[in-house]
Amino acid sequence: MLRDDLAGIRFDGNILPPPVMNVQKHTFEGADIAVIEVFPSKTPPVRYKGRIYIRTGPRCGIATYEEEIRLSEKRISGNLPFDTQPILGATIDDISTDLFQNGYLPYAIAPEIIDNNQRTIFEQMTSLRFLTKSDGPPTAMGILIAGKDPQYWIPGAYVQFLRIEGKELTDAIKDQKEIRGILPQQLRMLDELIRLNISVALEIPDYQATDIKIPDYPFKALQQLICNAIMHRRYEGTNAPVRFYWFSDRIEIQNAGGLYGQATASNFRTTPDYRNPTIAEAMKVMGFVQRFGVGIKIADKELAENGNPPLEFQFESTYTQVIIRKKI
């Protein structure tokens, strides 16, 4: 009787979506016990009587809005990631076939394979996940890598740059830019912008004939960190840009979306995960990423060698921020 009552929890409508569970009877030290095995939901968040409950240590409580977002992202990670989902309303005409053929395809596929295969360009685009199917809509990655107007379809897919003469956001703004276009264009423009804003001091050590150039920030560290922000940010459900704020004493880079998948605040340097795996793949194909999982390590190394303080990270459920302190 008790076993039937427990099994009936699955169907009483209080838990939605209905849980997948097994209820079994076992005997332990002469007494009958019921063992309930509940399997993780593939479509979180799960609600009980309209509420989402989470466990934080020994406490069980109702999830906040930010915690609900994190649970929803787990659902996405179990299905197609956003960057491979179709952009509804967009068509093949919204992708630049010239950009794809000349700026991506030769780097993604070996030349002899391109020469020998008989695929149409649309079949090639589908194979490389720029289209959902040869006559279907483009994917988010296709729009971001080779779209004619990516910000029309994904409004937050740009970088907001501010150069501030002071330590507070309310201080005078020396320069401001919105870095738009496809992601490869953004990354190239950001490289140039970083080089223009780095200050280089000259030191002449005793008994040496050559000057030593010491930048206030190492270029490679900033390059890796802004690339990480663009690669790992959340594009869906937000119109927030990547924020690249250059203060007089520090740089702040903030992107939408908290840590994803198996990455946590304690293991993100050694156990990365990818919210946008096909965008990450595309950035690797085009040479913006040499190896996966080493961006933060490169930044750490460059900053240490240049004499900058260690990176400071802030992880929230809705955004991630890194602070790079100026060389003292």
Identify what each model region corresponds to.
Residues 1-221, 226-328:
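Conserved N-terminal catalytic/coupling substructures associated with nucleotide/phosphate chemistry
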